From Swiss-Prot:
Signal sequence region: none
Binding note for cofactor: Binds 1 FMN per subunit.
EC number: 1.3.1.14
Protein name: Dihydroorotate dehydrogenase B (NAD(+)), catalytic subunit
GO molecular function: dihydroorotate dehydrogenase (NAD+) activity
Originating species: Enterococcus faecalis (strain ATCC 47077 / OG1RF)
């Protein structure tokens, strides 16, 4: 039997291919199930879940930018109970689709409460920890910008979680390396990166920011070079697996993420412009890998990581 060249294995996740719709760009999968069989995907990162329902920020929440978009959705979601009782059971009809649950909160207790429960869902195989949220107990500073706070949060959720934890790193920091190292010391099983870059657009007629929240997260092709740089940086100091994301829209983008040090790839904003983007990437990968002399993604991951170790 021929080995699947697209298969990758990372903590908690045995993936038939590395393509994962990113959290916040795929809802809870229901909308995209009308377009194609979700079982084709490697995994799904579902929308952020908080202990209680959140209604999000006032509108407008989205603004177009050259080669990207700004969003300030505000973690709108139905809350943990609805996700557990309604959203996740609907995805159980896809037996070959491991779910990564994205968890967010306003304080450490929020994260602990959600992580303790959500991993008990039979199809949730890993948790993605969104640490770009403001910490209300510490003046609203994001959890992911302070190594000590990030360490404590990671350690706290690891104590209660029954599935591996992937911490989502923010690019809105001076130096990402000490934060990644603190998270690894806290017991994380891997990283997902990068989250959005903070940005703003101004309406020339009103002379005010377009977004009601004023600032929003920049995503799309514009941020890919930033993602590649930061993935490479983190991969050079840590052996933990990385789910790379940020501006992926082509097969070459996927392979570039792997060559930077990723072990799987998240696809976000591209889902809005082409609902079929994930199946297209999965279909296109084998041919491009053959052209580039890549036997398998597992082999590519091994070669890249060994090269980075030798370069230290």
């Amino acid at each position: 039997m021929m080995k699947n060249p697209l298969a990758v294995s990372i903590p908690g996740l045995t993936l038939k291919n590395p393509i994962i719709p990113a959290s916040g760009c795929f809802g809870f999968g229901e909308e995209y199930a009308n377009y194609y069989d979700l079982d084709q995907l490697g995994s799904i990162m579902i929308k952020a879940t908080t202990p209680q329902a959140r209604y999000g920020n006032p509108t407008p929440r989205v603004a177009e930018t050259p080669s990207g978009m700004l969003n300030a959705i505000g973690l709108q979601n139905p809350g943990l109970d609805v996700v557990m009782q309604e959203k996740l059971p609907k995805l159980e009809k896809y037996p070959n689709l491991p779910i990564i649950a994205n968890v967010a909160g306003a304080c450490e207790e929020d994260y602990v409460a959600v992580c303790a429960k959500i991993g008990q869902a039979p199809n949730v195989k890993a948790i993605e920890l969104n640490i770009s949220c403001p910490n209300v107990k510490h003046g609203g500073i994001a959890f992911g910008t302070d190594p000590e706070v990030a360490f404590q949060l990671t350690q706290a959720v690891k104590k209660v979680a029954s599935v591996p934890i992937y911490v989502k790193l923010s690019p809105n920091v001076t130096d990402i390396v000490p934060i990644a190292q603190a998270i690894e010391a806290g017991g994380a099983d891997g990283f997902s990166m990068i989250n959005t870059l903070l940005g703003m657009r101004i309406d020339l007629k009103t002379r005010k920011p377009i977004l009601a929240n004023q600032t929003g997260g920049l995503s799309g092709p514009a941020i890919k070079p930033v993602a590649i740089r930061l993935i490479r940086q983190v991969a050079s100091v840590s052996q933990l697996p990385i789910i790379g994301m940020g501006g992926v829209q082509t097969v070459d983008d996927v392979l570039e993420m792997f060559m930077a040090g990723a072990s799987a790839v998240g696809v976000g904003t591209a889902n809005f412009t082409d609902p079929y983007i994930c199946p297209k990437l999965i279909d296109g990968l084998p041919k491009r890998m053959e052209e580039l002399g890549i036997e398998s993604l597992e082999q590519l991951i091994k070669e890249v990581r060994e090269g980075q170790q030798n370069a230290r």
